[in-house]
Structure formats: C-alpha cells, structure tokens
From Swiss-Prot:
Enzyme nomenclature, EC number: 1.1.1.267
Protein name from the UniProt record: 1-deoxy-D-xylulose 5-phosphate reductoisomerase
Keywords: Isoprene biosynthesis, Manganese, Metal-binding, NADP, Oxidoreductase
Upper classification of the organism: Bacteria, Pseudomonadati, Pseudomonadota, Alphaproteobacteria, Rickettsiales
Pathway: Isoprenoid biosynthesis; isopentenyl diphosphate biosynthesis via DXP pathway; isopentenyl diphosphate from 1-deoxy-D-xylulose 5-phosphate: step 1/6
Family: Belongs to the DXR family.
Length: 387
C-alpha cells in the first residue's frame, strides 16, 4: 500500500484526487490532508479516506475543525507549523493542489524535507519558484511530476522517448469559454459566461485563465523550467476538442502526440502510480466517436494574454518578470471574479504591472515573496484607479 498526502485537498483538483484514491482505496493510505479554510469539506474528507492528520491554514478555524472531528483519531494542526509538519511526513507521493503562489512555500518545505515524489497540480509555484525551486529539487533528489494535462502529456512522452533530438514541444489549449466570441463582445462578458468551460471541469480562477489564454503563457514558462528546454523550442496550438494534450516533434520530422479523454483524473492516476500505471478507472478514449479533431493557431490579437509567456522568456530577467506576471494575473482575476474590473482589463492590468515593477535580483525565497508583495500592491493600485 502506497502512502500519500494531499495539499489543497478541498479545491477542484484536490477533490478529484480524493475521488481517484477512493476508487483505489485498497492501494493508498492517506497520511495528511491540507486545506486553506473549508473546514466542513476537510473534516468530511478526513473521515472518508481515514486520514491520519489534517492541517487547516486558517488558525482561526481550529476549534471548528476540532469539533467536526470529535471522536476520531485524526491529528489536527494549523497554520505554517502544521504545513511544515505535514511536509515532513515520510510518504510515497505528495499531491500538491494548492492554488496560486500560495503553493510555493509548502513546495519549498516539501523539497527541503526530501520527499520522494511531488505530483504538482500548481503551475504558479513553478513560474514563481523558477530555477531556485528546481535547483533545490535536484539537490534533494526529489521527483517533480506535473499533473496538468499538457505537461503531464509531455512528461509521459519524454519519459519514454528520446530527449536529445527535440525540435519542438507543443502545448495544446482548448481555447476556453470565449474562443469563438468576437473581441467587442468580450467587453461586457459576465463572470458566469467566462467560467463556463466547454470541456474541462475546473475551478473559477483557472477557468478565467483559460478564457484569457493567460494559462497558456503560464504553461509555456512552466514547460521552460520543467523540461529545461530553450524558449524557441516551445509552441502553443489551439485544439478545441482537448483530445491531444501535448506534442513532441523531433528533428527528423517525426511527431509524438499524447491523447486521452479530457479528464484530469487520468493524469492524477498516472502521477499516483508513477513510474508504473494503474488500470483505467474512468472513461477511455474512443476515437471513432470524434468526427474530426481541430487545430488552429492562437489569435494573439484577440487573446494577447497568450503572448506574455513568450515575451517574458525573451527578457533578461525571466525570473522576476515571471513572478510579476503571475502575481498581477492573480490580482486581476480575483478583481474580475469580484466584479471590480471587466474581462478585457485583466491582461491590461498585467502589462501595466510589468511596466511599473522591477525586481532586480531573485536569489532566495524571500526575494520571490518580496517581489510578489510589490507586484501585488502595484496591481491592486492599478485596479483601484480603473474604478
């Protein structure tokens, strides 16, 4: 039986991880569940998977969580101390599903503790942690395996094939909820229309990122770090059916594509069984049911957010600009979800923040967090002026 801890268990991806574990309950023992503030769901999850330990990040919710778990043997911890305790547990797999840059510090704790495998469903920690994070992972001999479908696809292709003669790595994108909408129509698009993804079941933040196509820029930067590939070897193509998740092209003209139904549970299953595979628990791909598969170049005029990743990788300060980009996007998306700005304002806020913030040296975790703090303040000020 394999042991696993889940950071961010109450989020959209975290709940899918719980579903996969429950479907293979004889194969996994859950050591720890970590959540931000959803005590009701955290307590419920702890009971159904028989977790040994739970951590709630919000220290003010300790008593409520304690009451909910009264009569069980579940250990309860809170805040940063609890996060460090969970990170220090000896487990076979850690599933990192915390949303946003909030995952970065726990990632550092986990890698520093020398965990065996981190299945990473968080692109922001890679974008902001950059080379510092991966240098530490190499030093501690920690395997970081991406859960996001696109990077998981590329990881699986490269794991089984030649890594030396790559011509291009292509990340696919469904195009999000607004792919076929006219630019002018986007000015008055509602939050509900934006987060109604046509293919994937995702949380609100990533659904907005998909609609702006900023997620593809984040994924380009993520791929740059995950696969140690030169920026000019990275590409994006729009594929609305979301059947092909990634393509690796070689110098001899051969292309290897990874295909599956669009279900995050498939990549979750892979990371929970790596380097092996488990039997399929869900719907399998039936190509005959698809009359066609569509591929198209992204419209960078309609979706300027897709340019950001490539532009940042061409700058002299990739790490700092990646942090500023990610932070500005987090602030702008939150403002949009709270109806403080319009949809088209999101990318404008990002570009304005990049123009106004300059973090010169990123040499430590504290430098990353300081740069994030500055960008957070500037992006918030820009949004206030828009109102």
């Amino acid at each position: 039986m394999k042991t696993v801890s889940i950071f961010g268990s109450t989020g959209a991806i975290g709940q899918m991880i719980i579903d996969v574990i429950l479907a293979s309950s004889d194969s996994y023992q859950v050591k720890a569940l970590v959540a931000k503030s959803n005590v009701q769901l955290l307590a419920f999850q702890a009971k159904i998977v028989n977790a040994e330990m739970v951590v709630i990040a919000d220290v003010g919710l300790y008593k409520e969580l304690k009451d909910l778990l009264f009569g069980t043997n579940v250990k309860i911890s809170v805040g940063d101390v609890g996060m460090q305790m969970a990170a220090s547990l000896n487990v076979d797999y850690v599933m990192m599903a915390i949303v946003g840059i909030a995952a970065l510090v726990p990632m550092v704790y986990l890698i520093s503790a020398g965990v065996k495998v981190i299945a990473l469903a968080n692109k922001e920690s890679v974008v902001c942690g950059g080379t510092l994070l991966f240098n530490l992972a190499r030093e501690k001999n920690v395997n970081v395996i991406p859960v996001d479908s696109e990077h998981n696809a590329i990881f699986q292709i490269l794991h089984s094939n030649d890594r030396e003669n790559i011509d291009k790595i292509t990340i696919t994108g469904s195009g999000g909820a607004l792919l076929y909408m006219d630019y002018d129509q986007m000015r008055n698009i509602t939050v509900q229309e934006t987060i109604k993804h046509p293919v994937w079941k995702m949380g609100k933040k990533i659904s907005v990122d998909s609609a702006t196509m900023v997620n593809k820029s984040l994924e380009i930067i993520e791929a740059y770090h995950l696969f140690s590939v030169k920026p000019e070897k990275l590409d994006v193509i729009i594929h609305p059916e979301a059947i092909v998740h990634g393509i690796v092209s070689y110098v001899d003209g051969a292309c290897i594509a990874f295909m599956s139904v669009p279900d995050m549970k498939i990549s979750i299953m892979y990371t929970l069984s790596w380097p092996n595979r488990m039997s399929m628990l869900y719907k399998k791909l039936n190509l005959a049911s698809y009359h066609q598969l569509t591929f198209m170049k992204p419209d960078i005029n309609k979706f300027p957010g897709i340019r950001l990743g490539f532009e940042i990788l061409r700058t002299s300060n990739i790490h700092a600009n990646s942090i500023i980009f990610n932070t500005a996007n987090e602030i702008a998306v939150d403002a949009f979800l709270n109806r403080k700005i319009g949809f088209l304002d999101i990318v404008n806020v990002i570009y304005s923040t990049l123009d106004m913030v300059d973090c010169l040296h990123i040499n430590s975790l504290s430098d990353i967090l300081e740069c994030d703090s500055i960008a957070r303040r500037v992006a918030s000020d820009i949004i206030c002026k828009l109102n």
